[in-house]
Amino acid sequence: MPQTMQHHLPESLVLVIFGGSGDLTKRKLIPSLYQLFKQDKLPIRFSVLGLGRTEYSDVAYREHLDEALQRYLSDGEYDASLAEQFLSGVYYLPMDPASAEDYPKLREQLKTLDERINNPGHYIYYLSTPPSLYGVIPQHLASVGLNEEGEEDTNGEPSAIRRIVIEKPFGYDLQSARELNEIYRKSFHEHQLYRIDHFLGKETVQDIMALRFANGIFEPLWNRNYIERVEITAVENMGIESRGGFYDQTGALRDMVQNHLAQLVALTAMEPPVQFNADLFRNEVVKVYQSFRPMTPEEIRRRVVRGQYTESEWKGEHQRAYREEDKIASDSRTETFVAMKLYIDNWRWQGVPFYIRTGKMMPTKVTEIVIHFKPTPHRVFATADGSTVPNQLVIRIQPNEGISLKFAAKVPGSGFEVKKVSMDFTYDQQMGGLASGDAYSRLLEDCMLGDPTLFTRSDAVEMSWRFFDPILDLWKEEDFPLYGYPAGTWGPKQSDLIIEREHSWTNPCRNLTHSELYCEL
């Protein structure tokens, strides 16, 4: 495969964070930018401008972020001297992102920063705000000319870089996604839009492509002839925490399935691009979404299960039900669990079921893909109980990131009994581990480089919503069941029914080499 396209870091840049006083900024964005600063991966002349309704002076804002760095960086990563250097380029502007009257003030503040760091107007806008502001901010930026890139030079580079990063969810359904795309098209070009999905910033997610397309031993087997089924799990062992107001309007399907899990399905199922560049890679993602087999209402009822966690005794204490959480209605029908069986109608995957699930308050926190290969056509060897050993490839996204190949080996001694063994690759042992803030650091760096490969394109957003919309519509009917499951369990028992009769979900634990356990290690 030809080499990746080359992208260049500008010499100067201002990163403008809408929602600069919010949770995402202090937990993820600032720690990730600090990591890039330590690695000399930021532009030579770089500033951050935080925006928000909270009143901060520049000094108070830096102190607030310094506390966040000490709290959210991994042990040993915080350096007081480096943090001071990094934060010296951070500024704050109190303003209301929803108010058009405040944007001339933003424009003037950016001019001041441009003069301070000799910046020709290169800006990246990061929308770390409630989704209700996603349609407002681009229009207000355009009203004061902060969307315009200017004339291109002989290398095709604009005189002023203007990019905008939008957090998920991008739309609430297909119609709202289309409307949002139309709003952005009026103010920005597609190449300026970076719809971020932090799952794609994880090294282990990107390693799916390396595993498939950089190794000749896997790709010949990566099809309906050798793979029996694919299973993708992304679950958490905590509830909604302080996100009650947001989560009750969103639910697990919008929060996780339509974006994160759909992307994992696409990376697992996509065809190899001719070369690894943004458009060719994203074209293949869209083709997978186009191949999702639509489900009739009857098929949705058989193949999709939704659930909501109920109270239980777990971890030695009482766990309250979802409906007892803060800012949640006592009769809420918002799902905290989704399990689904879907098919991809194309040459490679025809007839192979993809089982996906996500949930809150599960026994452990884990995201992994399990490729189940078909058994041998004739059983020559068997285990002690007479069964055959299935071949599986486990791709652990998080935690204990790595890849494990499960296969049969002969038990030493007389006879020909076999047992399941594994060959394991872990990032900790062979790559020196992964830095904290890894996913956001990678995606922020890509955005500054102008590489949109790992960001979602508008047509992919709409194609994904096109598949999931009928499910959401059917859920509006009162008779569609919402099953309860005790907090700390693997979801409603009804989710087992969507797996083929002879199969069951793989319930992993956090230790890659002991995937049949589901304890928290």
Provide a role label for each language-model segment.
Residues 1-166, 170-521:
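Secretory/organelle targeting and membrane-embedding segments
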